[in-house]
From Swiss-Prot:
GO terms for biological process: methylation; rRNA processing. One of its GO terms (molecular function) is S-adenosylmethionine-dependent methyltransferase activity. The gene is rlmM. One of its GO terms (cellular component) is cytoplasm. It is found in: Cytoplasm. It comes from Shigella sonnei (strain Ss046). Its EC number is 2.1.1.186. Monomer. S-adenosyl-L-methionine binds at residues 188, 221-224, 240, 260, 277. This is Ribosomal RNA large subunit methyltransferase M. Catalyzes the 2'-O-methylation at nucleotide C2498 in 23S rRNA. It catalyses: cytidine(2498) in 23S rRNA + S-adenosyl-L-methionine = 2'-O-methylcytidine(2498) in 23S rRNA + S-adenosyl-L-homocysteine + H(+). PANTHER family: RIBOSOMAL RNA LARGE SUBUNIT METHYLTRANSFERASE M, RIBOSOMAL RNA METHYLTRANSFERASE FTSJ DOMAIN-CONTAINING PROTEIN. The keyword Transferase applies.
Amino acid sequence: MNKVVLLCRPGFEKECAAEITDKAGQREIFGFARVKENAGYVIYECYQPDDGDKLIRELPFSSLIFARQWFVVGELLQHLPPEDRITPIVDMLQGVVEKGGELRVEVADTNESKELLKFCRKFTVPLRAALRDAGVLANYETPKRPVVHVFFIAPGCCYTGYSYSNNNSPFYMGIPRLKFPAEAPSRSTLKLEEAFHVFIPADEWDERLANGMWAVDLGACPGGWTYQLVKRNMWVYSVDNGPMAQSLMDTGQVTWLREDGFKFRPTRSNISWMVCDMVEKPAKVAALMAQWLVNGWCRETIFNLKLPMKKRYEEVSHNLAYIQAQLDEHGINAQIQARQLYHDREEVTVHVRRIWAAVGGRRDER
């Protein structure tokens, strides 16, 4: 199995391909990407037979920006007989995976695949039973074993393979299923909620998204992102010349500051979170975020970088490298992650967490 399938947002296949080619090459795993425009997936074909497994084992999935999910696969199965689609799939997976922990029968996130998705859901139950009988799947679901993927690209036409549960997306098709809260002021609220799911482990939410924290929302109007912070019982400074939703102001947790987000400077020294979703050039936003982090004005930040029409991967990489360089220059240790979320459009969402000193009095504990 020398191919890796990467699911992505339709229209961003070139960026996904450029990224995996770059990051696989850095680890001396060489190959080439097969790209079909608006297909919603990319296939990276490695030159060496075992390099597909090596890639999904060694390259951290969290380091990828444009991939929603990935898994290693073998050759394409075509012309599956309608009377028995199961046997060829079982035969393909036997000897490749033993006692997998979960089965996901998936498609790309395109309009053309929606009809196929209905079939996948029905097909999952009998296929799971057959894979358990064959020993490909364990008799019970477990997150400690590899995930078995069956990826349909057309009726009767699929790739089969696996991913490692400690280095993949935990979500079906790489998409968290979130429901829009009726009381939220705008649909952008789902971007921040998804970012929390993607960037912050579930067992750390109570500590890192805690009641009573102080937060700042730059470019807050009408309050889609502020809503997520208020929902978690934080106190929020919402910075924007535009008005905030009255429902948020009525909570008593929001202080509306009619200022330009680029000029605002916090007066508190205990701000845990700064979030920012402003329509501005990515370099300008990156510079502002670096300033907040270098000065210790917040512990963690989630922000969006709007993408240009061309060279999107290069632009994002350049801005992330700039932030990293600023942090390095000032001796600040931090974790940086970026992802094009399901609820993002022409943008990527970035999370930066300062690793604060254990010893009091350090300059990064101001």
